[in-house]
């Protein structure tokens, strides 16, 4: 067990709560100095997760005493209401705060999260769209909107979200790989999208050569393309070239790329035994 609450993973809320209780009992919280406020927030969330609402309220009170009416503290109180009161009470609280300050981003996001948890997907989508009209640069909000679109199988809308994220972070390989994933899904009904999927996977490994997700995606795309008949492959390639001006690889290039992706995957597997086991299942 770590002796620092801040180093305990958020996925271990019981350990966080136990360590806090121990250190508080032995008056060891002073060692955190200015980081004590991060400790209180971490313990607050962990306590809500484990159902220890008395401890959660105590942590919130200390944060509120120090940062009264701050956006972060008000957002945490909304989380407390979600866990201890009714959804209606929490929503009323969020609406009240937004009527005071429509630009309160923390509260706005908490409200949207609550809408999603309540199954009000359409309202959540519209709320995120409205939010992004004002706060376009919020990558987290774009990712949330994309995730919701994927959950309702609106893959083309999800692609739009990731394309917007790419504009904000053009050198993030994970975004291009995710675009590759989405085009791969669309390719199940329209094989032309294998080319677009391949293009984005290739861009992800161009940015980061050691990015396994990208190489694995390349191997899957190439495998699908090589299983097509030569006539069908040429027909798809002509369709792709009609849509965009990019030069896509020919059949031989796809074959070479496939072999390269397999070699790369083998190298990753040699370094990571667990990854090797997963690859053997694919």
UniProtKB/Swiss-Prot annotation:
Pfam families: TPR_EMC2. Keywords: Cell cycle, Cytoplasm, Nucleus, Repeat, TPR repeat. One of its GO terms (biological process) is protein insertion into ER membrane. Signal peptide: none annotated. TPR repeats lie at residues 16-50, 71-104, 139-172, 174-211. It is found in: Cytoplasm; Nucleus. The keyword Oxidoreductase does not apply. PROSITE patterns: TPR, TPR_REGION. One of its GO terms (cellular component) is cytosol. May be involved in cell cycle regulation. PANTHER family: TETRATRICOPEPTIDE REPEAT PROTEIN (PTHR12760). This is TPR repeat protein oca3. The gene is oca3.
């Amino acid at each position: 067990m770590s002796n620092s609450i801040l180093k305990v993973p958020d996925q271990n809320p019981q350990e966080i709560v136990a360590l806090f209780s121990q250190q508080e009992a032995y008056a060891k919280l002073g060692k955190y100095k200015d980081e004590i406020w991060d400790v209180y927030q971490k313990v607050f969330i962990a306590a809500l997760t484990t159902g220890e609402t008395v401890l959660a309220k105590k942590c919130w009170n200390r944060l509120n005493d120090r940062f009264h009416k701050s956006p972060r503290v008000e957002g945490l109180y909304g989380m407390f209401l979600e866990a201890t009161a009714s959804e209606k009470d929490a929503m009323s609280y969020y609406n009240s705060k937004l009527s005071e300050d429509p630009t309160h981003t923390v509260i706005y996001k908490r409200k949207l999260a609550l809408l999603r948890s309540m199954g009000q997907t359409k309202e959540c989508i519209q709320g995120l769209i409205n939010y992004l009209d004002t706060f376009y640069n919020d990558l987290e909000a774009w990712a949330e909107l994309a995730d919701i679109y994927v959950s309702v199988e609106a893959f083309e809308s999800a692609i739009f979200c990731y394309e917007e994220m790419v504009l904000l972070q053009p050198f993030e390989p994970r975004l291009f790989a995710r675009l590759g994933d989405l085009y791969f899904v669309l390719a199940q009904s329209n094989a032309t999208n294998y080319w677009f999927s391949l293009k984005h996977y290739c861009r992800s490994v161009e940015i980061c050569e050691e990015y396994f997700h990208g190489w694995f995606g390349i191997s899957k795309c190439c495998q699908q393309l090589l299983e097509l008949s030569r006539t069908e492959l040429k027909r798809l390639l002509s369709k792709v070239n009609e849509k965009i001006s990019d030069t896509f690889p020919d059949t031989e290039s796809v074959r070479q790329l496939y072999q390269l992706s397999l070699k790369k995957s083998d190298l990753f597997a040699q370094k990571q035994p667990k990854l090797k086991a997963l690859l053997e299942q694919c």
